[in-house]
Curated annotation (Swiss-Prot):
Gene3D superfamilies: Pseudouridine synthase, RNA-binding S4 domain. Its EC number is 5.4.99.23. This is Ribosomal large subunit pseudouridine synthase D. Its main location: cytoplasm. One of its GO terms (molecular function) is RNA binding. Responsible for synthesis of pseudouridine from uracil at positions 1911, 1915 and 1917 in 23S ribosomal RNA. Residues 25-97 form the S4 RNA-binding domain. The gene is rluD. The active site is at residue 145. GO terms for biological process: enzyme-directed rRNA pseudouridine synthesis. It is found in: Cytoplasm. InterPro entries: PsdUridine_synth_cat_dom_sf, PsdUridine_synth_RluA-like_CS, PsdUridine_synth_RluC/D, PsdUridine_synth_RsuA/RluA, RluA_PseudoU_synthase, S4_RNA-bd_sf. Belongs to the pseudouridine synthase RluA family.
Protein backbone atom coordinates (compact mmCIF):
# COMPACT_ATOMS: atom_id res chain seq x y z
CA UNK A 1 0.00 0.00 0.00
CA UNK A 2 0.98 3.62 -0.45
CA UNK A 3 2.33 5.35 2.64
CA UNK A 4 0.92 8.91 2.77
CA UNK A 5 3.63 9.99 5.19
CA UNK A 6 6.23 9.12 2.60
CA UNK A 7 4.76 11.37 -0.08
CA UNK A 8 7.29 13.97 -1.28
CA UNK A 9 6.46 17.65 -1.32
CA UNK A 10 6.06 17.64 -5.10
CA UNK A 11 2.45 16.51 -5.72
CA UNK A 12 3.42 15.21 -9.16
CA UNK A 13 5.62 12.55 -7.54
CA UNK A 14 3.92 9.51 -6.01
CA UNK A 15 5.64 6.93 -3.82
CA UNK A 16 4.75 3.51 -2.46
CA UNK A 17 6.32 0.37 -1.01
CA UNK A 18 5.73 -2.95 -2.75
CA UNK A 19 3.92 -5.24 -0.26
CA UNK A 20 5.57 -8.53 0.64
CA UNK A 21 2.66 -10.52 -0.77
CA UNK A 22 3.45 -9.10 -4.23
CA UNK A 23 6.66 -11.16 -4.42
CA UNK A 24 6.94 -13.05 -7.70
CA UNK A 25 4.58 -10.77 -9.59
CA UNK A 26 5.24 -8.43 -12.53
CA UNK A 27 6.14 -4.79 -11.91
CA UNK A 28 3.40 -3.41 -14.19
CA UNK A 29 0.65 -5.52 -12.60
CA UNK A 30 1.58 -4.47 -9.06
CA UNK A 31 1.96 -0.83 -10.09
CA UNK A 32 -1.62 -0.88 -11.39
CA UNK A 33 -2.82 -2.04 -7.96
CA UNK A 34 -0.74 0.53 -6.09
CA UNK A 35 -2.04 3.40 -8.25
CA UNK A 36 -5.54 2.41 -9.47
CA UNK A 37 -6.35 6.02 -10.36
CA UNK A 38 -4.17 5.65 -13.47
CA UNK A 39 -4.82 3.33 -16.40
CA UNK A 40 -2.57 0.32 -17.00
CA UNK A 41 -1.51 1.66 -20.38
CA UNK A 42 -0.45 4.99 -18.86
CA UNK A 43 1.51 3.27 -16.07
CA UNK A 44 3.21 1.02 -18.61
CA UNK A 45 4.27 4.10 -20.60
CA UNK A 46 5.74 5.66 -17.47
CA UNK A 47 7.72 2.50 -16.73
CA UNK A 48 9.18 2.50 -20.24
CA UNK A 49 9.96 6.23 -20.16
CA UNK A 50 11.67 6.05 -16.77
CA UNK A 51 8.96 8.04 -15.01
CA UNK A 52 8.14 5.01 -12.84
CA UNK A 53 11.23 3.83 -10.95
CA UNK A 54 11.87 0.72 -8.88
CA UNK A 55 14.32 1.30 -6.01
CA UNK A 56 15.35 4.50 -7.79
CA UNK A 57 16.26 2.75 -11.05
CA UNK A 58 14.56 2.09 -14.36
CA UNK A 59 12.88 -1.29 -14.68
CA UNK A 60 10.91 -3.21 -17.27
CA UNK A 61 7.15 -3.84 -17.08
CA UNK A 62 7.77 -7.60 -16.93
CA UNK A 63 10.40 -7.48 -14.17
CA UNK A 64 9.60 -9.75 -11.21
CA UNK A 65 9.30 -8.17 -7.77
CA UNK A 66 10.64 -9.47 -4.44
CA UNK A 67 8.48 -7.39 -2.13
CA UNK A 68 9.65 -4.43 -0.07
CA UNK A 69 10.97 -2.39 -3.00
CA UNK A 70 10.28 1.34 -3.16
CA UNK A 71 8.34 2.69 -6.11
CA UNK A 72 8.43 6.29 -7.29
CA UNK A 73 6.17 7.58 -10.05
CA UNK A 74 6.57 10.94 -11.75
CA UNK A 75 3.03 11.78 -12.83
CA UNK A 76 3.24 13.08 -16.39
CA UNK A 77 -0.14 14.11 -17.74
CA UNK A 78 -0.90 15.93 -20.94
CA UNK A 79 -2.82 19.09 -20.09
CA UNK A 80 -5.05 21.59 -21.87
CA UNK A 81 -2.82 24.64 -21.23
CA UNK A 82 -3.22 25.68 -24.87
CA UNK A 83 -6.97 26.13 -24.36
CA UNK A 84 -8.11 29.29 -22.59
CA UNK A 85 -11.08 29.32 -20.21
CA UNK A 86 -14.05 31.04 -21.83
CA UNK A 87 -17.39 31.97 -20.31
CA UNK A 88 -19.68 29.80 -22.42
CA UNK A 89 -22.97 28.72 -20.81
CA UNK A 90 -23.30 25.02 -20.01
CA UNK A 91 -26.46 23.10 -19.21
CA UNK A 92 -25.51 20.80 -16.33
CA UNK A 93 -27.62 17.68 -15.79
CA UNK A 94 -25.63 16.22 -12.88
CA UNK A 95 -22.40 16.94 -11.04
CA UNK A 96 -20.35 15.92 -8.03
CA UNK A 97 -16.65 15.97 -7.16
CA UNK A 98 -15.82 13.24 -9.68
CA UNK A 99 -18.02 13.79 -12.74
CA UNK A 100 -19.89 16.47 -14.63
CA UNK A 101 -22.77 15.52 -16.94
CA UNK A 102 -23.85 18.15 -19.44
CA UNK A 103 -26.35 18.69 -22.25
CA UNK A 104 -24.23 19.81 -25.21
CA UNK A 105 -26.06 22.07 -27.65
CA UNK A 106 -25.83 21.56 -31.39
CA UNK A 107 -23.17 23.79 -32.94
CA UNK A 108 -20.66 23.47 -30.11
CA UNK A 109 -17.37 21.76 -31.03
CA UNK A 110 -15.92 19.56 -28.27
CA UNK A 111 -12.15 20.14 -28.75
CA UNK A 112 -10.19 23.10 -30.16
CA UNK A 113 -8.68 22.34 -33.54
CA UNK A 114 -8.21 23.56 -37.08
CA UNK A 115 -11.02 25.96 -37.87
CA UNK A 116 -12.19 25.99 -34.24
CA UNK A 117 -9.35 27.42 -32.12
CA UNK A 118 -11.67 28.47 -29.31
CA UNK A 119 -15.32 28.76 -28.19
CA UNK A 120 -15.40 24.99 -27.73
CA UNK A 121 -16.71 22.73 -24.99
CA UNK A 122 -13.18 22.41 -23.58
CA UNK A 123 -12.95 26.20 -23.24
CA UNK A 124 -16.30 26.21 -21.45
CA UNK A 125 -15.28 23.38 -19.11
CA UNK A 126 -12.04 25.11 -18.13
CA UNK A 127 -13.99 28.25 -17.24
CA UNK A 128 -16.46 26.34 -15.09
CA UNK A 129 -13.79 24.20 -13.40
CA UNK A 130 -10.17 25.43 -13.78
CA UNK A 131 -8.92 22.24 -12.07
CA UNK A 132 -9.79 20.35 -15.27
CA UNK A 133 -6.58 21.79 -16.76
CA UNK A 134 -4.71 19.07 -14.85
CA UNK A 135 -6.89 16.26 -16.24
CA UNK A 136 -5.99 14.92 -19.71
CA UNK A 137 -8.26 16.34 -22.44
CA UNK A 138 -9.95 18.47 -19.77
CA UNK A 139 -11.80 15.37 -18.61
CA UNK A 140 -13.51 14.59 -21.91
CA UNK A 141 -13.85 10.80 -22.27
CA UNK A 142 -16.16 10.60 -25.31
CA UNK A 143 -17.30 13.01 -27.98
CA UNK A 144 -20.36 14.23 -29.80
CA UNK A 145 -20.10 15.69 -33.29
CA UNK A 146 -20.39 19.46 -33.54
CA UNK A 147 -24.00 19.39 -34.71
CA UNK A 148 -25.14 16.48 -32.56
CA UNK A 149 -26.81 17.63 -29.36
CA UNK A 150 -27.24 15.85 -26.06
CA UNK A 151 -25.79 14.29 -22.96
CA UNK A 152 -22.04 13.91 -22.29
CA UNK A 153 -20.10 12.91 -19.18
CA UNK A 154 -16.86 14.66 -18.21
CA UNK A 155 -14.39 13.30 -15.65
CA UNK A 156 -13.23 15.83 -13.05
CA UNK A 157 -10.32 13.70 -11.78
CA UNK A 158 -7.77 11.37 -13.35
CA UNK A 159 -9.22 8.52 -11.29
CA UNK A 160 -12.71 9.16 -12.66
CA UNK A 161 -11.37 9.47 -16.19
CA UNK A 162 -9.56 6.15 -15.96
CA UNK A 163 -12.67 4.38 -14.66
CA UNK A 164 -14.97 5.88 -17.29
CA UNK A 165 -12.61 5.09 -20.16
CA UNK A 166 -12.43 1.49 -18.94
CA UNK A 167 -16.24 1.31 -18.83
CA UNK A 168 -16.46 2.65 -22.37
CA UNK A 169 -13.84 0.18 -23.59
CA UNK A 170 -15.71 -2.68 -21.92
CA UNK A 171 -18.97 -1.47 -23.53
CA UNK A 172 -20.55 -0.98 -20.12
CA UNK A 173 -21.82 2.55 -20.77
CA UNK A 174 -25.39 2.72 -22.10
CA UNK A 175 -25.86 5.44 -24.73
CA UNK A 176 -29.21 6.03 -26.42
CA UNK A 177 -29.83 8.52 -29.21
CA UNK A 178 -32.89 9.90 -30.96
CA UNK A 179 -32.49 10.04 -34.74
CA UNK A 180 -34.93 11.11 -37.44
CA UNK A 181 -34.14 9.30 -40.68
CA UNK A 182 -35.35 9.31 -44.26
CA UNK A 183 -37.73 6.47 -45.10
CA UNK A 184 -40.67 4.79 -43.36
CA UNK A 185 -38.97 1.85 -41.67
CA UNK A 186 -41.21 -1.08 -40.73
CA UNK A 187 -39.08 -2.52 -37.93
CA UNK A 188 -35.99 -2.04 -35.83
CA UNK A 189 -32.79 -4.02 -36.13
CA UNK A 190 -29.03 -4.04 -35.66
CA UNK A 191 -26.40 -2.52 -37.91
CA UNK A 192 -23.26 -4.60 -37.51
CA UNK A 193 -20.82 -3.18 -40.03
CA UNK A 194 -17.15 -2.18 -39.53
CA UNK A 195 -16.23 1.47 -39.95
CA UNK A 196 -13.04 3.23 -41.02
CA UNK A 197 -11.93 6.35 -42.86
CA UNK A 198 -13.48 6.90 -46.27
CA UNK A 199 -10.93 5.85 -48.92
CA UNK A 200 -11.18 9.16 -50.81
CA UNK A 201 -12.90 11.76 -48.62
CA UNK A 202 -10.87 12.25 -45.42
CA UNK A 203 -13.70 14.17 -43.77
CA UNK A 204 -15.95 11.13 -43.90
CA UNK A 205 -16.11 7.67 -42.44
CA UNK A 206 -17.42 4.64 -44.32
CA UNK A 207 -18.42 1.02 -43.87
CA UNK A 208 -15.33 -0.98 -44.82
CA UNK A 209 -14.52 -4.66 -44.53
CA UNK A 210 -11.15 -3.88 -42.97
CA UNK A 211 -12.56 -1.30 -40.54
CA UNK A 212 -13.05 -1.43 -36.78
CA UNK A 213 -16.05 -3.33 -35.53
CA UNK A 214 -19.11 -1.13 -35.07
CA UNK A 215 -22.55 -2.13 -33.78
CA UNK A 216 -25.68 0.04 -33.56
CA UNK A 217 -29.03 -1.25 -32.32
CA UNK A 218 -32.11 0.69 -33.40
CA UNK A 219 -35.85 0.50 -32.82
CA UNK A 220 -38.85 2.46 -34.01
CA UNK A 221 -40.09 5.29 -31.81
CA UNK A 222 -42.48 6.94 -34.25
CA UNK A 223 -43.26 6.29 -37.91
CA UNK A 224 -44.21 9.14 -40.21
CA UNK A 225 -45.34 9.08 -43.82
CA UNK A 226 -41.87 9.05 -45.33
CA UNK A 227 -39.60 9.36 -42.29
CA UNK A 228 -38.98 7.51 -39.03
CA UNK A 229 -37.91 8.53 -35.54
CA UNK A 230 -35.54 5.91 -34.16
CA UNK A 231 -34.03 5.13 -30.78
CA UNK A 232 -30.43 4.11 -31.46
CA UNK A 233 -28.26 2.38 -28.88
CA UNK A 234 -24.50 2.31 -29.34
CA UNK A 235 -22.64 -0.88 -28.56
CA UNK A 236 -19.41 0.65 -29.89
CA UNK A 237 -18.44 4.29 -30.29
CA UNK A 238 -16.85 4.87 -33.68
CA UNK A 239 -16.62 8.31 -35.25
CA UNK A 240 -19.94 9.23 -36.96
CA UNK A 241 -21.16 5.69 -36.19
CA UNK A 242 -24.95 6.20 -36.23
CA UNK A 243 -24.72 8.56 -39.19
CA UNK A 244 -22.65 6.09 -41.22
CA UNK A 245 -24.77 3.08 -40.29
CA UNK A 246 -28.06 4.78 -41.15
CA UNK A 247 -26.69 5.96 -44.50
CA UNK A 248 -25.42 2.42 -45.13
CA UNK A 249 -28.97 1.15 -44.53
CA UNK A 250 -30.26 3.67 -47.13
CA UNK A 251 -32.03 5.66 -44.40
CA UNK A 252 -29.71 8.62 -43.80
CA UNK A 253 -30.35 11.04 -40.97
CA UNK A 254 -32.38 14.10 -41.93
CA UNK A 255 -30.20 17.16 -42.46
CA UNK A 256 -26.90 15.27 -42.40
CA UNK A 257 -24.49 17.37 -44.50
CA UNK A 258 -21.97 14.54 -44.96
CA UNK A 259 -24.06 11.41 -45.35
CA UNK A 260 -27.57 12.67 -46.13
CA UNK A 261 -27.30 12.88 -49.90
CA UNK A 262 -29.72 14.90 -52.00
CA UNK A 263 -32.82 16.25 -50.26
CA UNK A 264 -35.82 13.96 -50.75
CA UNK A 265 -39.26 15.52 -50.41
CA UNK A 266 -42.27 13.22 -49.90
CA UNK A 267 -44.88 13.38 -52.65
CA UNK A 268 -47.60 15.81 -51.68
CA UNK A 269 -45.64 17.23 -48.73
CA UNK A 270 -47.12 20.30 -47.08
CA UNK A 271 -45.43 23.63 -47.66
CA UNK A 272 -44.54 23.64 -43.98
CA UNK A 273 -42.76 20.29 -44.25
CA UNK A 274 -40.93 21.32 -47.42
CA UNK A 275 -39.69 24.44 -45.65
CA UNK A 276 -38.70 22.49 -42.52
CA UNK A 277 -36.71 19.87 -44.44
CA UNK A 278 -34.96 22.48 -46.57
CA UNK A 279 -33.97 24.65 -43.63
CA UNK A 280 -33.00 21.93 -41.13
CA UNK A 281 -29.25 22.43 -41.40
CA UNK A 282 -27.85 19.85 -38.99
CA UNK A 283 -28.13 16.11 -38.59
CA UNK A 284 -31.34 15.28 -36.69
CA UNK A 285 -29.45 13.37 -34.01
CA UNK A 286 -29.65 13.84 -30.25
CA UNK A 287 -27.84 11.94 -27.47
CA UNK A 288 -30.84 11.42 -25.24
CA UNK A 289 -29.75 9.13 -22.41
CA UNK A 290 -26.44 8.13 -20.80
CA UNK A 291 -26.05 5.48 -18.11
CA UNK A 292 -22.80 4.53 -16.37
CA UNK A 293 -21.45 3.39 -13.03
CA UNK A 294 -20.14 6.15 -10.81
CA UNK A 295 -16.31 5.92 -10.99
CA UNK A 296 -15.91 6.00 -7.19
CA UNK A 297 -19.12 4.75 -5.56
CA UNK A 298 -20.00 2.22 -8.25
CA UNK A 299 -23.62 3.33 -8.08
CA UNK A 300 -25.53 3.62 -11.38
CA UNK A 301 -25.90 7.13 -12.77
CA UNK A 302 -28.55 7.90 -15.41
CA UNK A 303 -28.89 11.26 -17.11
CA UNK A 304 -31.27 12.36 -19.84
CA UNK A 305 -31.15 15.45 -22.05
CA UNK A 306 -34.50 16.84 -23.24
CA UNK A 307 -35.16 16.83 -26.97
CA UNK A 308 -34.10 20.27 -28.28
CA UNK A 309 -36.62 22.66 -29.78
CA UNK A 310 -35.45 22.29 -33.40
CA UNK A 311 -35.84 18.52 -33.30
CA UNK A 312 -39.22 18.77 -31.57
CA UNK A 313 -40.34 21.16 -34.28
CA UNK A 314 -39.19 18.79 -37.05
CA UNK A 315 -41.09 15.87 -35.53
CA UNK A 316 -44.22 17.97 -35.03
CA UNK A 317 -44.25 19.01 -38.70
CA UNK A 318 -43.66 15.41 -39.82
CA UNK A 319 -46.50 14.28 -37.56
CA UNK A 320 -48.88 16.89 -38.95
CA UNK A 321 -47.95 16.00 -42.54
CA UNK A 322 -48.62 12.32 -41.86
CA UNK A 323 -51.98 13.09 -40.27
CA UNK A 324 -52.98 15.26 -43.24
CA UNK A 325 -52.02 12.54 -45.72
CA UNK A 326 -54.00 9.94 -43.75
CA UNK A 327 -57.04 12.23 -43.70
CA UNK A 328 -56.86 12.76 -47.46
CA UNK A 329 -56.60 8.99 -48.01
CA UNK A 330 -59.82 8.43 -46.06
CA UNK A 331 -61.83 10.81 -48.24
Amino acid sequence: MSDPSAEPLDPSIRQAIVPDNAAGRRFDAVLAELFPEFSRSRLSEWIKSGDALLDGEMARPRDTLRGGESVQVQVVLETQTHAAPQDIPLSVLYEDEQVLVIDKPAGLVVHPGAGNPDRTLVNALLFRDPALASVPRAGVVHRLDKDTSGVMVVARTVQAQTALVEQLSAREVHRQYLAVVVGALVSGGTANAPIDRHPRDRLKMAVRDDGRDAVTHYRLRERFRAHTALECRLETGRTHQIRVHMAHLKSPIVGDPLYGGALKLPKGATDELVHELRTFKRQALHAETLEFLHPVSGEPVRASAPVPADLQRLMTVLREDSARAAELARR
